[in-house]
Protein backbone atom coordinates (compact mmCIF):
# COMPACT_ATOMS: atom_id res chain seq x y z
CA UNK A 1 0.00 0.00 0.00
CA UNK A 2 1.02 3.58 -0.56
CA UNK A 3 0.65 6.90 1.15
CA UNK A 4 -2.34 8.63 -0.44
CA UNK A 5 -3.53 12.22 -0.65
CA UNK A 6 -7.13 13.41 -0.95
CA UNK A 7 -8.76 16.74 -1.69
CA UNK A 8 -12.29 17.73 -0.72
CA UNK A 9 -14.50 20.75 -1.27
CA UNK A 10 -17.98 21.65 -0.15
CA UNK A 11 -20.19 24.71 -0.04
CA UNK A 12 -23.56 25.42 1.56
CA UNK A 13 -25.83 28.47 1.60
CA UNK A 14 -25.79 30.63 4.72
CA UNK A 15 -29.36 31.55 5.70
CA UNK A 16 -31.48 32.76 8.60
CA UNK A 17 -33.28 30.32 10.94
CA UNK A 18 -30.63 27.57 10.70
CA UNK A 19 -27.86 26.54 13.07
CA UNK A 20 -24.23 27.06 12.13
CA UNK A 21 -22.35 23.78 12.60
CA UNK A 22 -18.66 23.79 11.68
CA UNK A 23 -16.12 21.14 12.58
CA UNK A 24 -18.65 19.33 14.74
CA UNK A 25 -19.46 22.26 17.00
CA UNK A 26 -22.32 24.74 17.04
CA UNK A 27 -21.09 28.27 16.39
CA UNK A 28 -23.24 31.09 17.81
CA UNK A 29 -24.31 33.26 14.87
CA UNK A 30 -27.47 34.82 13.44
CA UNK A 31 -27.31 32.62 10.32
CA UNK A 32 -26.66 28.96 9.70
CA UNK A 33 -26.00 26.54 6.88
CA UNK A 34 -28.79 24.93 4.91
CA UNK A 35 -28.46 21.38 3.64
CA UNK A 36 -29.86 17.85 3.65
CA UNK A 37 -27.97 17.01 6.85
CA UNK A 38 -26.87 19.48 9.53
CA UNK A 39 -24.86 21.07 6.66
CA UNK A 40 -21.51 21.00 8.49
CA UNK A 41 -19.59 22.07 5.41
CA UNK A 42 -16.22 21.52 7.12
CA UNK A 43 -16.94 17.89 7.95
CA UNK A 44 -18.40 17.33 4.48
CA UNK A 45 -15.24 18.60 2.75
CA UNK A 46 -13.14 16.49 5.13
CA UNK A 47 -15.20 13.36 4.39
CA UNK A 48 -14.88 14.01 0.67
CA UNK A 49 -11.09 14.31 0.97
CA UNK A 50 -10.83 11.09 3.00
CA UNK A 51 -13.09 9.13 0.67
CA UNK A 52 -11.17 10.37 -2.36
CA UNK A 53 -7.82 9.50 -0.82
CA UNK A 54 -8.98 5.92 -0.24
CA UNK A 55 -10.60 5.74 -3.71
CA UNK A 56 -14.02 4.88 -2.28
CA UNK A 57 -16.18 7.47 -3.97
CA UNK A 58 -17.27 10.76 -2.49
CA UNK A 59 -19.69 12.07 0.09
CA UNK A 60 -22.54 12.09 -2.44
CA UNK A 61 -22.11 8.43 -3.42
CA UNK A 62 -21.59 7.19 0.14
CA UNK A 63 -24.19 9.42 1.82
CA UNK A 64 -26.67 10.45 -0.92
CA UNK A 65 -29.08 13.29 -0.22
CA UNK A 66 -31.82 11.05 -1.61
CA UNK A 67 -31.50 8.82 1.47
CA UNK A 68 -34.28 9.94 3.82
CA UNK A 69 -32.49 8.32 6.78
CA UNK A 70 -29.73 10.89 6.39
CA UNK A 71 -32.09 13.89 6.57
CA UNK A 72 -30.85 16.28 9.29
CA UNK A 73 -28.18 13.77 10.36
CA UNK A 74 -25.34 14.98 12.56
CA UNK A 75 -22.32 15.18 10.23
CA UNK A 76 -20.11 13.78 12.99
CA UNK A 77 -21.86 10.46 12.32
CA UNK A 78 -20.90 10.73 8.65
CA UNK A 79 -17.27 11.40 9.59
CA UNK A 80 -17.23 8.43 11.98
CA UNK A 81 -18.59 6.18 9.21
CA UNK A 82 -16.07 7.63 6.75
CA UNK A 83 -13.26 6.76 9.15
CA UNK A 84 -14.64 3.19 9.36
CA UNK A 85 -14.39 3.01 5.57
CA UNK A 86 -10.78 4.28 5.75
CA UNK A 87 -9.84 1.73 8.42
CA UNK A 88 -11.46 -1.08 6.41
CA UNK A 89 -9.07 -0.21 3.57
CA UNK A 90 -6.20 -0.50 6.10
CA UNK A 91 -5.47 3.23 6.22
CA UNK A 92 -5.50 5.89 8.90
CA UNK A 93 -5.24 9.67 8.89
CA UNK A 94 -1.74 11.08 8.87
CA UNK A 95 -2.85 14.72 8.72
CA UNK A 96 -5.60 17.03 7.49
CA UNK A 97 -5.27 20.63 6.34
CA UNK A 98 -8.57 22.51 6.15
CA UNK A 99 -9.36 26.05 4.96
CA UNK A 100 -12.75 27.61 5.72
CA UNK A 101 -13.75 30.49 3.42
CA UNK A 102 -16.07 32.64 5.54
CA UNK A 103 -16.67 36.36 5.99
CA UNK A 104 -18.45 36.20 9.36
CA UNK A 105 -18.34 35.04 12.09
CA UNK A 106 -14.66 35.00 12.97
CA UNK A 107 -13.66 31.39 13.69
CA UNK A 108 -10.33 31.66 15.54
CA UNK A 109 -11.93 31.37 19.01
CA UNK A 110 -13.64 28.11 17.95
CA UNK A 111 -10.79 26.35 16.13
CA UNK A 112 -9.31 24.61 19.22
CA UNK A 113 -12.71 23.09 20.05
CA UNK A 114 -13.20 22.00 16.42
CA UNK A 115 -9.80 20.31 16.40
CA UNK A 116 -10.59 18.50 19.66
CA UNK A 117 -13.91 17.27 18.29
CA UNK A 118 -12.48 16.10 14.97
CA UNK A 119 -9.43 14.45 16.58
CA UNK A 120 -11.68 12.43 18.87
CA UNK A 121 -13.83 11.18 15.99
CA UNK A 122 -10.83 10.47 13.76
CA UNK A 123 -8.80 8.84 16.57
CA UNK A 124 -5.81 11.06 15.98
CA UNK A 125 -3.83 13.77 17.71
CA UNK A 126 -5.11 17.36 17.47
CA UNK A 127 -1.71 18.27 16.04
CA UNK A 128 -2.57 16.23 12.94
CA UNK A 129 -5.45 18.58 12.10
CA UNK A 130 -4.93 22.12 10.83
CA UNK A 131 -7.94 24.43 10.48
CA UNK A 132 -7.59 27.92 9.06
CA UNK A 133 -10.19 30.56 8.22
CA UNK A 134 -9.97 33.20 5.53
CA UNK A 135 -12.31 35.76 4.02
CA UNK A 136 -12.95 36.56 0.38
CA UNK A 137 -12.40 40.28 1.04
CA UNK A 138 -16.15 40.94 0.67
CA UNK A 139 -16.16 39.51 -2.88
CA UNK A 140 -18.59 36.94 -4.29
CA UNK A 141 -21.19 34.86 -2.46
CA UNK A 142 -18.85 34.36 0.49
CA UNK A 143 -18.16 38.08 0.77
CA UNK A 144 -21.89 38.82 0.66
CA UNK A 145 -22.33 36.23 3.45
CA UNK A 146 -24.55 34.05 1.26
CA UNK A 147 -22.53 30.89 1.82
CA UNK A 148 -19.47 29.20 3.26
CA UNK A 149 -16.96 27.09 1.33
CA UNK A 150 -14.36 24.70 2.72
CA UNK A 151 -11.31 23.09 1.13
CA UNK A 152 -9.73 20.04 2.79
CA UNK A 153 -6.58 18.10 1.99
CA UNK A 154 -5.70 14.87 3.77
CA UNK A 155 -2.83 12.44 3.81
CA UNK A 156 -3.67 8.86 4.74
CA UNK A 157 -1.08 6.21 5.49
CA UNK A 158 -1.15 2.41 5.68
CA UNK A 159 -1.66 0.59 8.97
CA UNK A 160 0.44 -2.54 9.39
CA UNK A 161 -1.08 -5.91 10.25
CA UNK A 162 -0.83 -5.48 14.01
CA UNK A 163 -2.61 -2.13 13.91
CA UNK A 164 0.40 0.11 14.43
CA UNK A 165 0.86 3.07 12.15
CA UNK A 166 3.71 2.74 9.64
CA UNK A 167 6.15 5.57 10.23
Swiss-Prot record:
Positions annotated to bind a divalent metal cation: 10, 12, 44
Q: What class of enzyme is it?
A: lyase
Record keyword Lyase present = yes
Sequence positions that bind 4-CDP-2-C-methyl-D-erythritol 2-phosphate: 10-12, 36-37, 58-60, 63-67, 134-137, 141, 144
Q: How does it assemble?
A: Homotrimer.
Homology family: Belongs to the IspF family.
Q: What is this protein called?
A: 2-C-methyl-D-erythritol 2,4-cyclodiphosphate synthase
Amino acid sequence: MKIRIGFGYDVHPLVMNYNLWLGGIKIPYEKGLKGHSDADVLIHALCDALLGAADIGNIGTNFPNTNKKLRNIDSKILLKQTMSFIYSKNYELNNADITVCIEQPKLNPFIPQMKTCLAEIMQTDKGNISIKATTSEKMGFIGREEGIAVFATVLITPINEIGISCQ
